[in-house]
């Protein structure tokens, strides 16, 4: 009976570790997609390509919803709030682009960048060998 219980606990621990690794890999994918999307947005804002800005800002809203869920699982409340704020500012960017308000687009893009910087400062740690890890 004790061997069976021990084996069951080992299997459960392995399953939880696998789920956590999968979540972390998903998170890295979201961050890479966010970086690429923000890079596109910078060029689109400069070119005043409002339909593209609206589309890519909406993509950010969806990514930040996933990020919110990721941090909610670990009860990292400040990161959840940051992800919610990032969703809101990305939605504002999409709305500004849809309305054709160039000044609002430029100002709101600064808000998107600030959202990224705030969360990275609080929850991203640079590794000595290169790359980053989630704090």
Outline where the language-model segments fall.
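Bacterial N-terminal signal peptides
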Residues: 7-15
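Short, solvent-exposed, charged loop/turn and helix-capping segments
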Residues: 63-82
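The canonical Cys-X-X-Cys-His
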Residues: 112-123
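Inter-heme linker and motif-flanking segments adjacent to c-type heme-binding CXXCH motifs
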Residues: 100, 122-128
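Immediate post-signal-peptide N-terminus of mature secreted/exported proteins
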Residues: 21-56
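Positively charged n-region of N-terminal signal peptides that target proteins for export
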Residues: 1-4
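Amphipathic, charged alpha-helical scaffolds that flank and support histidine-based chemistry
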Residues: 42-54, 87-112
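Short cysteine/histidine-rich metal-coordination sites, predominantly Zn2+-binding motifs
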Residues: 130-135
């Amino acid at each position: 009976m004790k061997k069976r219980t021990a084996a069951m606990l080992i299997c459960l621990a392995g399953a939880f570790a696998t789920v956590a690794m999968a979540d972390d890999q998903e998170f890295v994918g979201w961050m890479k997609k966010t970086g690429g999307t923000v890079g596109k947005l910078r060029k689109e804002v400069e070119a005043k390509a409002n339909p593209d800005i609206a589309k890519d800002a909406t993509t950010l809203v969806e990514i930040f919803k996933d990020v919110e869920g990721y941090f909610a699982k670990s009860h990292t409340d400040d990161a959840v709030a940051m992800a919610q704020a990032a969703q809101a500012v990305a939605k504002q960017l999409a709305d500004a682009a849809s309305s054709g308000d160039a000044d609002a687009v430029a100002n709101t893009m600064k808000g998107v960048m600030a959202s990224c910087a705030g969360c990275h400062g609080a929850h991203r740690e640079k590794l000595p060998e290169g790359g980053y890890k989630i704090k």
